Amino acid sequence: MTAPFRYDGRVALVTGAGGGLGRTHALLLAARGAKVVVNDLGSGPAGGGVDIGPAQKVVNEITAAGGEAAANTDSVTEGHRLVEATLDRFGRIDILINNAGFLRDVAFHNMKESDWNDIYQVHLYGAFRVTHAAWPHLRKQAFGRVINTSSAAGIYGNFGQTNYSSMKLAVHGFTQALAVEGRSKNILVNTIAPAADSRLTRTVMSEEQLKPMQPDYVSPLAAYLCHEKCQETGGLFEVGGGWVGKLRWERTLGAYLPTQNGISIEDIDAAWTKISDFSGAEHPGSMAEGGKPFAKIMGPG
């Protein structure tokens, strides 16, 4: 039997951990030996307000079970404060789970600039700020695990969520670039796109739908990706209800068009079936792999 995964000596910072997914992430890591900073503003699903109650409640659960944790209510847009609080309390940071977020759903034709900017500030800019503050410490100790949180809305799009969908797909672009930069320093970065009962999903899904989608079924994947044994990086995973799947980019073989006399709109139309044919598709996993068609055209440098 495989030895239990432990996180003794590790320190984790989990944002948005006062309830839902963040709470179960924090509880699981603490139960396996990690010291955890439970960050949460304590605001509602639409944002606004500060209340230490939700974060402190999770801390109380952890300490009652014999773990170590501290509550924090700083905004992720002030990421350095979260990281400083983690270092002040526990002396290091090893694991960062960017989970904080809220919804501001509105059809695009009714969307205000503030609806866009408020979602950007927390989901994307907030993830940047906290990760950017933690990054030098992860590099210095040559160890780090970062989890960014996406959504099916980011992968597939969803009505009334152009703001949220945009940030949630952008988060994975953030992950992919960080994975490239961090690998040499043993900083591994992955994205999860969870489907689970939470304060956010309760605003758009029924109680009956959410019954089998417990957040406890998501956190084991997040914790696995944070363990030193796991060497996965740059991955995107959908997870929920006891199911886990990995996604990757897929590209058709495409069509090489004659360029001697320039390329016309009609040339594109004539080649459209070939351009769109996914039989024999490729799965480029890096800039180098993605650039092969252009390298073939340009020839050796």
Task: Label the predicted regions.
Residues 25, 31-32, 140, 156, ...:
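Active-site-adjacent segment of SDR/Rossmann-fold oxidoreductases
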Residues 151:
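Residue(s) in the substrate-gating loop at a strand-loop-helix junction
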Residues 191, 209-300:
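C-terminal helical subdomain
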Residues 3-38:
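Canonical Rossmann dinucleotide-binding motif of NAD(H)/NADP(H)-dependent dehydrogenases/reductases
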Residues 59, 63, 69-73, 77-91:
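Conserved amphipathic alpha-helix within the SDR
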Residues 131-132, 176:
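A short, exposed helix-loop element centered on a Lys and neighboring polar residues
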Residues 62, 107-108, 112-117:
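Substrate-binding pocket helix/loop in short-chain dehydrogenase/reductase
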